[in-house]
From Swiss-Prot:
Tagged with keyword DNA damage: no
Family, similarity comment: Belongs to the ATPase A chain family.
Localization, UniProt: Cell inner membrane
GO MF, one annotated term: proton-transporting ATP synthase activity, rotational mechanism
GO biological process: proton motive force-driven plasma membrane ATP synthesis
Name of the protein this chain belongs to: ATP synthase subunit a
One Pfam family from the record: ATP-synt_A
InterPro entries, alphabetized: ATP_syn_F0_a_bact/chloroplast, ATP_synth_F0_asu, ATP_synth_F0_asu_AS, F0_ATP_A_sf
Gene: atpB
Amino acid sequence: MDERLFTFAGLINPNHDFIIGFHTLLVAVILLILARYATHKMQVVPSGIQNVFEFIISGIISFAKDIVGEQVARKYFPLAATIAFLVFFGNAIGIIPGFEAPTSSWSFTLVLALVVFFYYHFEGIRAQGVLKYFKHFMGPVWWLAPLMFPVEIISHFSRIISLSFRLFGNIKGDDMFLLVMLMLAPWIVPVAPFAILTFMALLQAFVFMILTYVYIHGAVVVDEEH
């Protein structure tokens, strides 16, 4: 018998796809409400939730520009930050008893990985042109092309698996960890495990965001040696 955590959505429909879809929609609504609230009455001197969001935004851009440069960090911030917030809240909602993290479903993480995969290729082709972009797949010298091209293709497709399974595996493991802790101490609020899971939720969102930036940077920045 499949042992599953209780969820409020499961009371409506026990189907797993419905539960994941319900929590995905819930996370999206929460993000929209927060974004609306933060930008409803914007002030020159920020305060409250506007101050929190501006601190987070400036922190993300500041960190990303050290890795991919300021131009890429700012230009692709909307996509990278949206994914980061979606992943974080998608992870964090599963920590609350009665809710399930949509990121614990491989279908959810696969969609995010595919969005990043197709987007960075699209941006790479738009920035460099089709021929020049795929020329980078051929290697530094023409006679290495038969070897380098399939290696590059496999490398790029492996990013889909890497992005989706890393997030899925970690959050699925967190769910099992939470299940075990609640079985061992159902009447005691496990503060330490919840703190660990919150940190892991933040870490996974950060990793996904940085990899998104790195993949886009690798696609759009022209290598002068080629």
